Amino acid sequence: MKPDAHQVKQFLLNLQDTICQQLTAVDGAEFVEDSWQREGGGGGRSRVLRNGGVFEQAGVNFSHVHGEAMPASATAHRPELAGRSFEAMGVSLVVHPHNPYVPTSHANVRFFIAEKPGAEPVWWFGGGFDLTPFYGFEEDAIHWHRTARDLCLPFGEDVYLRYKKWCDDYFYLKHRNEQRGIGGLFFDDLNTPDFDHCFAFMQAVGKGYTDAYLPIVERRKAMAYGERERNFQLYRRGRYVEFNLVWDRGTLFGLQTGGRTESILMSMPPLVRWEYDYHPEAGSPEAALSEFIKVRDWV
């Protein structure tokens, strides 16, 4: 079947609506929408929930950009894209909760297609979701990864393990020699066996995110915490900023190609702190995190 960009766009718009409704149902606060246009073609809907009952900040962004030619930074790695018009669309979100016992979460699903007359289109899907806890709870990690594994199963026995490994490899801070969190799923360049199969998998990942995340939020959101836990959360959020600005391909691509800066940086935590040569107290719950986020088989 020929790739149907319109069908993908409708799914993504509906996914943004659904996720925002689900997060509002948990939090009570509403999202504020900011629609924007891109000079070169396309635009998007950025939605942000700030200072809610549960979430300090949640950003859910839809974008659909198109143009007559790919930027040079993109065609350098993929010469087959030169001379083609393109469309890129996706939903990307990050949720930063108030409570340090509730993990930060990130999800993204996207579709890209490049066409020129007389040639087959070049297209692929990408996406995934990952979890960044500040305090480790095994039952939460198992639930997160079990949900990821279960949504992958209809698409093949090895799909979960392959995309879990890709996620572990991708969300890694080389300069710290540590994982960003406990991972989840990450996939890119997905275009086989056919459009329908790949689109169905992208939909499963998009819908699976809230199944994986919201039960954890409900379990942890009322746990009592104090200044110590909050300070540790803000310190660990620094790793999130470091990863996004130093290693994340999507952030770098967006900033280098004249993307909308406000939407690209919507993933940043609203408050964060760094402390020179900080080491948590030995034997403390804070010290246990470094072991908890090491790569392992959760299910």
From Swiss-Prot:
Region described as Important for dimerization: 240-275
Transmembrane segments: none
Record SUPFAM superfamilies: Coproporphyrinogen III oxidase (SSF102886)
EC number: 1.3.3.3
A GO term from the CC aspect: cytoplasm
Entry keywords, A to Z: Cytoplasm, Heme biosynthesis, Manganese, Metal-binding, Oxidoreductase, Porphyrin biosynthesis
Pathway: Porphyrin-containing compound metabolism; protoporphyrin-IX biosynthesis; protoporphyrinogen-IX from coproporphyrinogen-III (O2 route): step 1/1
Coiled-coil ranges from the UniProt annotation: none
UniProt cofactor(s): Mn(2+)
Residues binding substrate, per UniProt: S92, N108, V109, R110, G258, G259, R260
One GO BP annotation of this record: protoporphyrinogen IX biosynthetic process
Site (Important for dimerization): H175
InterPro entries found in the cross-reference section: Coprogen_oxidase_aer, Coprogen_oxidase_aer_sf, Coprogen_oxidase_CS
Positions contributing to Mn(2+) binding: H96, H106, H145, H175
Catalysed reactions, as listed in the record: coproporphyrinogen III + O2 + 2 H(+) = protoporphyrinogen IX + 2 CO2 + 2 H2O
Any one Gene Ontology molecular-function term assigned to this protein's record: protein homodimerization activity
Active site: H106
Subcellular location field: Cytoplasm
Biological role: Involved in the heme biosynthesis. Catalyzes the aerobic oxidative decarboxylation of propionate groups of rings A and B of coproporphyrinogen-III to yield the vinyl groups in protoporphyrinogen-IX.
Family, as annotated: Belongs to the aerobic coproporphyrinogen-III oxidase family.
Assembly and interaction partners: Homodimer.
Protein name, UniProt field: Oxygen-dependent coproporphyrinogen-III oxidase
Lineage, opening ranks: Bacteria, Pseudomonadati, Pseudomonadota, Gammaproteobacteria, Enterobacterales
Gene symbol of the encoding locus: hemF
